[in-house]
């Protein structure tokens, strides 16, 4: 942690996450609690934790996660995880809100029709849908014009009907992989990272 802080040339970070729910999660969490207590981290959180893993983490530690960064997009809406997080004071944050364009997201007729109705892009419709669900979104872009477009979602509101149409797109399936698949867990935990 100190090496990362030095490379960033900072005295503290605003948010620090455990990226996957594997390994010595409780040991890592307690170390993060100590860093938060020391003022090196303002908020601590997790990524890719299902409610059962969060319940375990909360039960055996002093500080509950401030954030849980999970895959949320129109095809994987996390209809159980999002309200569970919110009811426990954990802010859901959507990674891959556009599912990296998989499943034809940017051409989907429901999303394009809603976008046309408001004069907005599919990306803006998706980000607004996430916003209206009380979820923070983490939308990656390297293009300046796309970044500006992604910010411009506060001048319209999706109707209840729009929200229901998007809700109907849910397949409850990751566009990437299952964090509960034993083969994937073995692969992830077997990787050696040079940090």
Q: Where are the regions a protein language model picked out?
A:
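CE4/NodB-like, metal-dependent polysaccharide N-deacetylase domain
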Residues: 1-17, 34-38
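Beta/alpha (TIM)-barrel catalytic core signal, keyed to glycine-rich beta->alpha loops juxtaposed to Asp/Glu
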Residues: 20-195
């Amino acid at each position: 942690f100190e090496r990362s802080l030095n490379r960033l040339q900072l005295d503290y970070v605003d948010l620090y996450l455990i990226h996957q729910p594997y390994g010595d999660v409780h040991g890592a969490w307690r170390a993060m609690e100590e860093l938060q207590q020391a003022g090196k981290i303002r908020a601590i959180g997790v990524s890719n934790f299902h409610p059962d893993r969060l319940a375990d983490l909360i039960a055996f530690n002093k500080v509950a996660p401030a954030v849980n960064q999970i895959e949320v997009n129109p095809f994987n809406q996390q209809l159980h995880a999002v309200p569970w997080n919110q009811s426990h004071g954990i802010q859901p944050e959507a990674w891959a809100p556009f599912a990296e364009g998989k499943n034809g997201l940017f051409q989907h007729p429901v999303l394009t029709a809603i976008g046309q109705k408001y004069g907005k892009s599919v990306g803006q419709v998706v980000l607004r849908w996430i916003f209206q669900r009380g979820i923070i979104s983490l939308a990656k872009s390297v293009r300046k014009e796309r970044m500006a477009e992604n910010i411009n979602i506060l001048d319209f509101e999706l109707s209840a009907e729009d929200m229901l149409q998007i809700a109907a797109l849910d397949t409850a399936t990751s566009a990437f992989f299952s964090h509960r698949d034993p083969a994937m867990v073995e692969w992830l935990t077997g990787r050696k990272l040079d940090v």
